[in-house]
């Protein structure tokens, strides 16, 4: 019998149950008997930026794209194709790789327990052969070409390459033709046994199922036969400066696009609080309710595509601003002026209160569906905090904290601008 701890959220009147199984797997379950079906996320703490690591006293390196390759191959095992089995249960399944995690997910209204068993079976039982790995290489190469045709992907990749000289976050998630050619069954097994260990994974489930039943299904279906030791990621020795400050490219887009990046210091302390502080700063700098945003919008310098965002992971952190604009250099100049003015004038406590209230409301709305909750549970667990901790952090963040962060961040010497022109302008 597994002892589950109940984690409650007074702000939402909601709760979830958490436990670590005997094998080390973290299980989080938000029981919602009034909701139909379930949504499950099985997440591993390995992403495209998981590259250099120690295992068994040896330094090892995974080629770019290995985490994504593993994601593809784990859903094609000895039992066949996982998606075909999910189709038999009526489940809608998917898998994806980001810079710091790999997730296997499904949503189902019928045969939910069978679907959960399928998920656990496939991820805990890798099957890599020379033939199936070589076959997958062609499939991933086609996906890579489609992936690189996305303007959003192009903008992000180019900015990260401009900001980071060494850190593997500068490399594409899917890898390159050269790195894919270096991936072998033996290398995939090494990566799997180093990082697909129960202690480095979390299963989050939300919907009409009990935590006890989830634990029972884990014991029945999740039995990875691991070899060797866990991998320990080695930090990249990233220099402070940026690689370059301005670059221009082109592709088939209807209007010029841009992305501004500020290279920040990697988060060393409370990750949740730091990310929230930067989110609030971005809202106060150029949120849709600010005079600055509306001046840019009314003058035609930006449109509704404009965004700001923090982008953080192990050993990297940057803030990004971008969208469509015919004059991206002008937008950057005005943004620098806005930052300088805000540093001089200080953070307005009343505006901060409004921003916190808005973030609070967004958090409440984001925890509605089974998919929203399971995804948030898994992500927060891998980052080292609980989803409901967000409310306490928002309640205690101060204007002084934001002001100090503002004075130490958004450094013009650690900033870059990438411009993506329509092909006909190049």
Predicted regions and their residues:
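His/Glu-rich zincin catalytic helix
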Residues: 1-82, 189-295, 414-426
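Histidine-acidic residue clusters that define the catalytic metal-binding segment
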Residues: 2-18, 162-201, 235-237, 363, ...
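M16 family metallopeptidases and their MPP-like homologs
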Residues: 30, 35-53, 65, 81-123, ...
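Short, polar/flexible loop-turn hinges at active-site or ligand-entry regions and domain interfaces
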Residues: 124-131
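Short, low-order "capping/linker" segments at domain edges
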Residues: 145-149, 243-255, 360-371, 377
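Active-site-adjacent helix/loop patches that line small-molecule binding or acyl-intermediate pockets
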Residues: 150, 154
């Amino acid at each position: 019998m597994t002892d589950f701890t109940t984690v409650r959220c007074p702000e939402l009147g909601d709760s979830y149950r958490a436990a670590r199984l005997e094998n080390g797997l973290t299980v989080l379950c938000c029981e919602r008997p009034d909701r139909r079906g379930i949504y499950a996320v099985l997440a591993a703490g390995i992403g495209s930026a998981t590259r250099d690591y120690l295992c068994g006293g040896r330094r090892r390196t995974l080629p770019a794209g290995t985490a994504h390759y593993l994601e593809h191959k784990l859903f094609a095992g000895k039992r066949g194709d996982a998606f075909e089995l999910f189709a038999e249960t009526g489940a809608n399944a998917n898998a994806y790789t980001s810079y710091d995690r790999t997730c296997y997910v499904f949503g189902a209204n019928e045969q939910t327990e069978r679907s959960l068993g399928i998920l656990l079976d496939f991820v805990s039982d890798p099957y890599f052969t020379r033939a199936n790995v070589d076959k997958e290489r062609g499939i991933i190469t086609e996906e890579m070409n489609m992936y690189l045709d996305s303007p959003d992907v192009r903008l992000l990749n180019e900015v990260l390459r401009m900001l980071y000289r060494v850190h593997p976050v500068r490399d594409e998630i899917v890898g390159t033709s050269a790195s894919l050619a270096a991936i072998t069954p033996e290398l995939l097994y090494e990566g799997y046994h180093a990082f697909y260990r129960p202690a480095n994974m979390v299963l989050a489930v939300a919907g009409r199922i009990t935590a006890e039943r989830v634990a029972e299904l884990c014991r029945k279906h999740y039995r990875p036969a691991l070899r060797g030791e866990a991998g320990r990621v080695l930090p990249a020795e990233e220099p402070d400066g940026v690689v370059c400050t301005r670059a221009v490219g082109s592709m088939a887009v209807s209007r010029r696009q841009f992305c501004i990046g500020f290279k920040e210091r990697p988060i060393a302390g409370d990750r949740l609080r730091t990310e929230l502080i930067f989110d609030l700063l971005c809202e106060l700098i150029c949120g849709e309710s600010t005079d600055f945003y509306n001046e840019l919008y009314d003058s035609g310098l930006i449109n509704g595509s404009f965004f700001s965002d923090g982008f953080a992971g192990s050993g990297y952190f940057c803030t990004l601003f971008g969208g469509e604009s015919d004059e991206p250099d002008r937008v950057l100049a005005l943004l620098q002026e806005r930052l300088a003015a805000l540093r001089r004038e200080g953070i307005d406590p009343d505006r901060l209160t409004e921003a916190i209230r808005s973030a609070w409301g967004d958090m409440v709305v984001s925890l509605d569906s089974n998919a929203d909750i399971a995804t948030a549970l898994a992500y927060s667990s891998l980052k080292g905090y609980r989803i409901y901790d967000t409310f306490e952090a928002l309640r205690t963040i101060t204007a002084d904290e934001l002001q100090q962060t503002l004075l130490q961040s958004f450094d013009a010497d650690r900033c870059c601008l990438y411009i993506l022109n329509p092909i006909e302008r190049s």
